[in-house]
Amino acid sequence: MHEKRTRLIKKCNMKSGPLMYWMSRDQRAKDNWALLFTQDLAVKYNLPVIVVFCLVPQFLGATTRQYSFMLEGLKEVEKALAEKNISFFLITGLPGKKIPEFVEKHTVGALVTDFSPLRIKREWKKEIVQKIDIPCYEVDAHNIVPCWTASPKQEYGAYTFRPKIHRALPEFLENYPTLKKHPVTWKEKKGKADWKKSMLTLEIDQTVPPVDWLKPGEKFAQKTLRTFLKN
């Protein structure tokens, strides 16, 4: 994994608890640099890995349709992680409050999260970093060229930005390693999400129902992509 894909956003001494990946933007078990980085770091220190997703009561006008689609996909993530000996936890509330509480309660050793340019995620991250006293890493698991290395300044337009991306592609185009079955089990608690109860915590528009013509989950997403590339 390219070292420029990761940055340390809080420097502290690591604790002895599990390494925690706060999954947010990149909701998948496969081809996820943030998850792979967390596992590599955990293997280095012989520690367990846990993945936590914080379900917020409302998000930028999302309705039952969007939340239902997302949660069905996360069910698939939970199952895939269990096969790799990694516990998945679904917690509810605002990340700025709930993530630090989880970190303290379970003596988390270090925190890893995926990068998002949205202001709301940056505000959550800032609040969390201020409250925790463990190392915190941010990994760009979304872009081929990490956002913070793409350009040192605000670009005028695509015509000035595109050449920089093209020059950086050979450096960052690399194959994903396979997520391994994690060798260290977290014996304290096994994650088991209560999906129905979590849905009841949402403060969203319930009048927009889920659709049945589009299937959620990373497996179907990969199948759709392969079909598109083939045809």
Question: What are these language model-derived features?
Answer:
Residues 1-176, 180:
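Trp/Phe/Arg-rich N-terminal binding region typifying the photolyase-homology
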Residues 154-231:
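Glycine/tryptophan-enriched, flexible segments
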